[in-house]
Amino acid sequence: MAAPRHASALARAARQPAADLRRRDRGAPDDAWIRERLRAAAVGTLATVRDGQPFLNANLFAYEEAVDGLGTIWLHTAHVGRTAANVALGAPAPVCFSVFEMGRMLPASRALEFSVEYAGVVAFGSGLVVEDAAAQRHGLALIMAKYAAHLQPETDYEPPTDADLARTSVFRVEIESWSGKTKAAPDDVPGAYRWPATGAPT
């Protein structure tokens, strides 16, 4: 099999730390920017791997800041499933987690030069299935507080019972490193548009 084009450059890229960016000019301005993206994102995608097979699961989540360290991501899924198996059988399982927001399309005179505004974060760390009931309730309470902030536990809904906890898997991702990447163009860029464009085929 012939070597791929740019083989030496690809080999160097493969040896870089996971959170390193090729385009440093588009890196997040600071860690506060990354934390804000993790707090505000509606959905995140968790990547796990088992026996060489990658697996992605998009899910609701909550990000919890830490006094020391980068913080924790909390998620939950069904009690038995691929995500639960990949994390439990590999614990502490190497995982990564991503959130992404798309902005405007930025047209150009050549197809190669088209671009897009974006803001995204990739976090790398260790995934664990949470077994302690108090910790499970803590993580689930953070998720409820994020997505149902206008409702009050005990008043508007019943918090998870022991029976409920037996039916779900709660996961904790301890973030070890992260990177953020963003591109934003001036408001007056000619022809910039939101996708899908009005009149575009559907």
Question: What do the PLM-derived regions correspond to, one by one?
Answer:
Residues 74, 96, 124, 172-174:
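Beta-strand secondary-structure signal
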Residues 16-45:
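Short, basic/aromatic recognition patches
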Residues 79-139:
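Short, structured beta-strand-loop surface elements
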Residues 45-50, 108-111, 127-132, 154-161:
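Short helix-to-loop capping/linker segments positioned immediately adjacent to catalytic or ligand/cofactor-binding
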Residues 41, 92, 116, 165-168:
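Short gly/pro-enriched beta-turn/loop segments at secondary-structure junctions
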Residues 1-20, 131-202:
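C-terminal edge-of-domain segments
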